[in-house]
Design a protein with these regions (language model features):
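Structured catalytic/nucleic-acid-binding cores of DNA maintenance enzymes
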Residues: 1-287
Length: 287
């Protein structure tokens, strides 16, 4: 499942391509036909990401809510869209009516100002009213990538809980946007065992952990991949081979079970928590 940085990148991309334009919406698959009909002809006012949720805000207080889930995928391109292939839940095309405003928009390599977007396989694709958008935000924890995030709201949950810290950080009602990679890597960098009960995390420990999540996720937005390894542990600094993994990026423990820790040489451990794999270093994260 895409982690929060991916959704923030999509929100920025869609604003760049479509904000200020009227859009034509269609559902080639048919499952979002009514919603697409309501969107067609409206102007996209702006976009935002909240955790793993993507929101398009249209004129007339229409909000498109998308959650990609495990299988969702978004593609886009310039000009006329290609013939529909596969199960396209939603296709958006812009009419190119907005004037060029310079900046990154002017850098787009396109023969005209029109663009298209295809959404396939999302867990959620729906229109929300303003109260429903507010309810969605209210049920999510703070998002480390948002300026309005209140980390103390998350810590209020964590410090009262006996639930393992890794499980709390994966709970989107506690912290929004964090997935397994960010969680296991941030815990490693903080030297915290993933099974540490939440109530044992000190205020200072939480402040450090939150700040590191903000930093790691911000870098991931900028680079388009998750890199968590400090400079001293990069391949060129250690004289080791780069990581080869479909997720890309350099990490400490994620999907590295049985191989030496970059810091201490202990074999990275793997365990399970609520049906999900966990990765940690028993030496560096002794607690």
């Amino acid at each position: 499942m895409p982690e929060g940085h991916t959704i923030h990148r999509l929100a920025a991309r869609h604003a760049e391509l479509f904000a200020g334009d009227k859009v034509h919406a269609a559902s080639p698959q048919g499952r979002f036909a009514d919603g697409a009909a309501r969107l067609s002809g409206t102007v996209l006012d702006g976009t935002e990401a909240y955790g793993k949720h993507l929101l398009h805000h249209y004129a007339g207080e229409l909000t498109l809510h998308v959650h990609l889930g495990l299988y969702g995928k978004v593609t886009d391109g310039p000009g006329e869209p290609p013939p529909p292939v596969g199960q396209i839940r939603l296709r958006l095309t812009s009419d190119g009516s907005r004037s060029r405003r310079g900046g990154r928009r002017a850098e787009l390599e396109s023969s005209d100002d029109r663009h298209w977007l295809d959404l396939r396989g999302p867990t959620a694709c729906e229109l929300l009213t303003p109260p429903e958008v507010a309810a969605l935000r209210d049920r999510l924890g703070p998002d480390p990538l948002r300026a309005d995030a209140d980390p103390e709201r998350a810590y209020a949950r964590i410090r009262r809980s006996t639930t393992p810290l890794a499980a709390l950080l994966l709970d989107q009602t506690v912290v929004a946007g964090t997935g397994l990679i960010f969680v296991v890597e941030a815990l490693f960098r903080a030297g915290l065992p993933p099974l540490l009960p939440g109530r044992k995390l000190t205020p200072a420990g939480w402040a450090e952990l939150w700040a590191d999540l903000v930093a790691l996720m911000t870098v991931a937005v900028e680079r388009g991949r998750i890199d968590t390894v400090r400079d001293v542990h990069l391949p060129e600094a250690m004289g080791r081979a780069p990581r080869v993994d479909r997720h890309g990026g350099e990490v400490y423990v994620y999907r590295r079970p049985g191989v030496p820790c970059h810091v201490c040489g202990t074999e990275v451990s793997r365990g399970a928590l609520a049906g999900r794999n966990l990765y940690w270093c028993a030496t560096c994260q002794a607690g």
